[in-house]
Amino acid sequence: MAGSATHLFLYDGAVFKAEADVMIPKRGSILLARHMAVRPADVVLDLGTGVGFLGILAARTARRVVATDVVPASVECARANAILNGVAHKMDFRLGDLYAPVSGMTFDLILANPPQMPTPPGRDDLKDPRLLADDGGPTGWATLDRILRDAPEHLRPGGRLLFTCFAFLGVRRALAKVEAAGLQGWIVGRELHPFPRIGLERFDLIRSLDDEGTIREEHGRLFVERLVVGAAAP
């Protein structure tokens, strides 16, 4: 009997289930998971939680985690995965766009692996949720800029924002944007990844944005660095 496929994803002793309409964690989320230093007293915000990957991993250490997502199916999936992994009592799942569901709240740590694939202007095929999940606007910064703009009002003194960023969006640009938001920035981690398949059909646009020449070609294959950028409140 036909039905929607269920995907299982295992990471560091945690189990994540997702139906076909919710994406499993990809390289950026895994990179961020390896570099998020969560403290026992932390109250954490997971922006765009998806299957709940980052929030659930953080909840194993943190005092409390709030996870938001604009997609109802993702919120329900993440809530189910929190129960599956025994951390539901430490988590609060909220439906809404980025910070909208946490108005007036502040956090010790904010985690984000947002859409950041540059999308050519005039694209009219973004009804596919899989494409929307990667849509960073014409420069790749559409969602990242919103996260940085509003981060200061949601960070406690000394609080940290950790977000992923393709190097072709600009390493210096990323740090300058963090500073412009009134935060102190640094590169937490970096890793070389095969060039994303979704980026190949928009390669000319991406190459035009790569002011720092970060895209590499080795043995006929393209590679790009993925960064974890830190931003700390005063």
Descriptions of predicted regions:
Residues R64-D69:
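Conserved SAM-binding motif I beta-strand of class I
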Residues P114-T143:
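Mobile active-site "lid"/loop adjacent to the S-adenosyl-L-methionine
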Residues V87-L98:
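Conserved SAM-binding strand-loop segment of SAM-dependent methyltransferases
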Residues W141-G199:
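Conserved Class I SAM-dependent methyltransferase catalytic core
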Residues V71-A73:
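Conserved SAM/SAH-binding beta-strand->alpha-helix loop
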Residues V171, L183-V229:
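Class I S-adenosyl-L-methionine
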Residues M1-T61, C77, L209-A232:
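SAM-dependent Rossmann-like transferase core, predominantly class I methyltransferases
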Residues Y99-I110:
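A short acidic, Gly/Pro-enriched loop at the edge of an enzyme's catalytic core
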